[in-house]
Curated annotation (Swiss-Prot):
Biological source species: Chlorobium luteolum (strain DSM 273 / BCRC 81028 / 2530)
Claim: Disulfide bond is one of the keywords in the record: no
Protein name: UDP-N-acetylmuramate--L-alanine ligase
Domain of life: Bacteria
UniProt cross-references to HAMAP family, sorted A to Z: MurC (MF_00046)
Name of the coding gene: murC
Amino acid sequence: MELGKTKRVHIVGIGGAGMSAIAELLLKSGFAVSGSDLSTGEVTDKLQQHGAVIYRGHEAGQVADCDVVVYSSAVRPDANVEISEALKSGIPVVKRDEMLGELMRYKSGICVAGTHGKTTTTAMIATMLIESGESPTVMIGGVSDYLKGSTVVGEGRYMVIEADEFDRAFLRLTPTIAVLNSLESEHMDTYGTLDELKRSFIEFANKVPFYGRVICSVDWPEIRRIIGSLNRRLTTVGIEEPADVTAGDIVMDHGRATFTITAFGTDYPGVCLNVPGRHNILNALSAFATGLELGIEPERLIAGLGRYSGMRRRFQVKFRDSRGLMVIDDYAHHPSEVKATVKAARSGWPDARVIAVFQPHLFSRTLEFADEYGWALSRADGVYVAAVYPSREKQEDFPGVDGALVAEAVRRAGGRQVAFVPDRDELLAAVLNEGAEPAPGGTILLFMGAGDITVLATEVAGRVSGGEGHARA
């Protein structure tokens, strides 16, 4: 059967970020889509509005009459009744990334990989291409207001994809341009060692055809260490390290950055980015280098970067008022991401009090990185650590591991006003009290984590709005 003859696709775990994005892409491409998840909500409601059939819970009969079943790495195929029924009935069962790889066959693929920043960089590339008159197909593991969602089905030849390294998913993709945005220890439950993770990044980059290109962000030491193993055409980007594409004359001011890009010896001054942080400038350099490789005029690329307005849960300002109180929601869940997010708040609003509200994600990650979280959070004026968000893990498998490990690490690193508050209501009250404290330079309530801390951020934004300023979901 050819993909074009496939009529109905059933997706197990359709409510997840990556799965809902591919469901949206399939719907917009004309496929009939059904899907199941243990819980439903805003994401599945939106898919239903686009025509998907959504089931709450998993039942064998829900895969009847479908042509293929797609599932994510978070689903155990041997423990899911729908997958078992599909296999018994002779219905093909594939992982999400295999389906994505099939959809890429008809396009020139631009794939952004990295342990950090890939969502933002993918969205920047998509914004630049659209603003330059291209009509790309786009799939991102996050929500962009500019794109009005996480996917775009375009008529042009380019497909821009966020390439996830978890479970080696990105190795099933076929990029023409591969962006290596960052690389450090992550997903050790998949890889076991950093060396094994690096080998997968090398394999991913070398999947690029001889006429393609690999964009490497060399400010990351582990990327510098693997460059010698990449046998494709390379472009390097960096701020701290010598590179083909660099940034200088950097000025940060209240959530905006202006700078000069120097690409292959030519200066392009006056670049404006409407999101804070040096890490976002580095992301912009990767996007700019990608645009140059596609032959787009630099002036159009710069204009496109100026239109980039951020992603939901990537330093998303959910509330601000005239007193300088801000509620910011960010997906940061790795120590490097937490450090960059706190630093962005500090550099963008140097006179403000920064109160970090951090929810550790996964017991295994909390155990592995507790000390690193301590250093990353210690630059905030106050730190509240929530209970660990378990996701796919169980507390009983990690005795003694909780948010207290992170709180103690923050204290050892010199952090001020540190508290571990596992009770949600107590945490809500404490954060609201912080927001009510007068501060001459304002107060930033900075929520970070990959779990449901975003729900608390939304509630705080609603509580403090009081009719002044603006609150956003």
